[in-house]
Amino acid sequence: MAQIEKKVGLLRKSSASKKPLKEKVVLMYDEIFTKEDPTKSNPRFWDELFLMKVNIEYLESKLESLDGEELMKLKDNINSLFQHCIHALRAEHQIRVVNSLQTLCALIRGVHQKNKPTSGFDIINMLMGFDKAELRMKNLMESLDLLLCGDGSESLKSLCLKLLLCLVTVTDNISQNTILEYVMINSIFEAILQILSNPLSRRQHGYDAVVLLALLVNYRKYESVNPYIVKLSIVDDENTLNGMGLVIARALFEYNRQYTDKEEENQTGFFSALTNMVGSMFIADADEKISVQTNEAILLALYEAVHLNRNFITVLAQSHPEMGLVAVPISPIPTTPTSPLGTTPPSSDVISPTELPMDADVQTSNLLITFLKYSSIVMQDTKDEHRLNSGKLCLIILTCIAEDQYANAFLHDDNMNFRVNLHRMPMRHRKKAADKNIPCRPLVCAVLDLMVEFIVTHMMKDFPMDLYTRCIQIVHKVLCYQKKCRVRLHYTWRELWLALINLLKFLMSNETVLLAKHNIFTLTLMVVNLFNMFITYGDTFLPTPSSYDELYYEIIRMHQIFDNLYSMVLRLSTNAGQWKEPASKVTHSLVNIRAIINHFNPKIESYAAVNHISQLSEEQVLEVVRSNYDTLTLKLQDGLDQYERYSEQHKEAAFFKELARSISINVRKNVAFNTLSQEILLKEFSTIS
């Protein structure tokens, strides 16, 4: 019946002899759209309006049906509606506050839809009037601040955050949203922090608060001084920072859990049984169903916290009691085009008060572990632009972490060992690793595992050059810390070396295809210089002398790849062309690797001949290596332990502008979809005293 009434409210004429009855609120909306002052016929018009249940659909559709010129004629009444909405936010009766918040959402969205370049009106003038805009927005922001910080209803606080998200995301490009200038002047930063520092409000509103903060931080961040950036960078309150970390961790964990559930469904269901019978022809389709959109909004919030606030780094490694708690959905969360896996906030709408412990290793978990698991999922599939950007953002966050001295200290801390079960891409030539076999190790081992996994699994013709470059840079920065602090990490370095050698082999094998799109020599030089780092400084950070011997063994064993690489870069560096200079740099960087190969290979051949052995074992080769170090001459190479620090503004501005745009569109869709559960709200506030 309620739906019929809504539809009736949208009808202008009826084919029946009698006109259909309209809701009273619809009749009142019609009065607002008649150019006359509605209080002339009813002095209590505005008081009565906010006692009526809001019909968002009708109000928005009414605004949508008008062209710019018609809307301009109604400016005075729209200004009055906006003004009285703000006034109603201070009302004693909470039902009025609820209705005013919902009306503001509909009004802002509806008017913004008409704000096209051809419409000929200014959004601020249409909603508030130029002369009153500053005062109106000041009053609005103060009222929202009071509601968010007060002891009132949690539903009201939720509505306030929805309204703010609506306000921020009405334009795709948030930096073009002129209303946000007033949100900069009348800051709600402290209200957001208060939500994050309080366990109850954080659990109910933390997700919206964190996403709102991430968006506000990205408003004109390169053009002017953004107060939200300044304030976020200096937050040092432990409860607030931990609260923000918990919200992010919970959202990431929820994504990980949903992914794992879907993965298990695919492995245990009928589909899995069918593919086992007929082979692997359907495997790609199954994986495609699992590899769905990441939650970029929460990822952006994590990035801004890590990038802007050095105090937040401590939160990454901190274990919390709440980290072991996960909210149980009352019903399955729908996965829709506007609400992909992981983007549905773990809000109070879908969470029961009951909370259960996570899996067995949760008690030794933290935000960084949750993020690494999350990254291992989203970095698996980078075939489309959206997934590529998600993987890029994960690597940018890891880059910031790898550059931080304190972060490196806890990453390498032998007293902080964790078992991190990263997700691995299904590949035909390798078995699925058993999670229980993963040992407890310092967290940096999981970071390196993630980098190795990416290197091994993304060698394809549509080569993600940018992601590979970032991946190698992260490994390099970790090695620089180990060299500087003489940290001897017990890690399976051979896996990294083999991954890097196979990457070089891939780049050479696909030289023609890749050179048509990329300068492969920048990446090649970075990979070769990683080997140079190990050769030059490995004795200061490799765990044992035998590890250093194994490095030489792998270089000698795979010498054909290095020989082929040298031939390729020598060919291109001696020919005039665009690759002459970059190829020449790689040629020079190979000097020590070639010296090792040219020094040890004859000695290995001689050893085999003297001992009448056709094929030497690994131990025999290592014996030759150990006994001939003293006659090896290597060239000292400068700058191997230096790197350029990450800079967002100079190199990543375009990426973050586009990312903020994508998030704004997605948040707007989600807010529009479940902005306001009116039945729940009206039930809560049905008693008007």
UniProtKB/Swiss-Prot annotation:
Described purpose of this protein according to its UniProt entry: May be involved in Golgi maintenance and protein secretion.
Entry's Gene Ontology cellular component terms: cytosol; Golgi membrane
Record's bilayer topology term: Single-pass membrane protein
Keyword Cytoplasm in record: yes
GO biological process terms on file: regulation of Golgi organization
Keyword Transmembrane: yes
Keywords: Cytoplasm, Golgi apparatus, Membrane, Transmembrane, Transmembrane helix
Pfam families, alphabetized: ARMH3_C (PF08427)
Protein's UniProt name: Armadillo-like helical domain-containing protein 3
Transmembrane segments: 520-538
Family the UniProt entry places it in: Belongs to the ARMH3 family.
Subcellular location: Golgi apparatus membrane; Cytoplasm
Chief localization: Golgi
